[in-house]
């Protein structure tokens, strides 16, 4: 469901030759989030939009509530749906953005226009969310003691080691509110 402001009526300006739905980045992000919540209620979704000179984009992050990535087949369905709302693709061979051909419409044939330039889907929680920190903690637990993680492990040991050492070490990367939420999640989940 979109706000009424997304509907542009024929003749509302001198350039509007037909009624259409303006699918800017903000509206696209909203539609994708609604889709995920409706069809995949166990999936946590973050959908944000950015507008900048020369274009716009939508970032979609999905995970389970414990921070783990969702099943690959579900992620592919979400990505496929999300990518329908991308205006085109960048062709690096000729250094040019190429717009998709054809017209997309709603079920009642109202045209959808002016999509974001890019839609990015990530099978991981949004940075800074509680789910992100839960994912990072589980990642550390899985890799602790390996050669690639010895320096990180030693930093956590300086903060007392274990779950509390990990929390204390990573606190500087969190806002106070995020830290409180992560502490609460650690008490109830881990």
Feature roles, as predicted:
Residues 1-190:
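Intrinsic low-complexity, intrinsically disordered or marginally ordered coil/linker segments
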């Amino acid at each position: 469901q979109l706000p009424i402001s997304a509907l542009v009526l024929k003749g509302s300006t001198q350039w509007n030759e037909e009624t259409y739905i303006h699918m800017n980045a903000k509206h696209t992000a909203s539609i994708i989030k609604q889709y995920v919540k409706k069809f995949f209620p166990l999936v946590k979704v973050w959908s944000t939009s950015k507008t900048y000179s020369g274009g716009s984009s939508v970032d979609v992050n999905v995970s389970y509530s414990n921070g783990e990535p969702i099943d690959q087949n579900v992620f592919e369905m979400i990505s496929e749906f999300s990518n329908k709302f991308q205006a085109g693709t960048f062709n690096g061979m000729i250094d040019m953005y190429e717009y998709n051909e054809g017209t997309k419409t709603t079920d009642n044939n109202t045209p959808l226009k002016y999509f974001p330039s890019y839609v990015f889907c990530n099978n991981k929680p949004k940075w800074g969310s509680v789910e992100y920190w839960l994912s990072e903690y589980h990642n550390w637990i899985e890799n602790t003691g390996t050669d690639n993680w010895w320096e990180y492990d030693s930093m956590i040991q300086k903060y007392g080691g274990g779950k509390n050492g990990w929390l204390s070490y990573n606190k500087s990367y969190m806002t106070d509110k995020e830290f409180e939420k992560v502490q609460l999640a650690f008490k109830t989940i881990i």
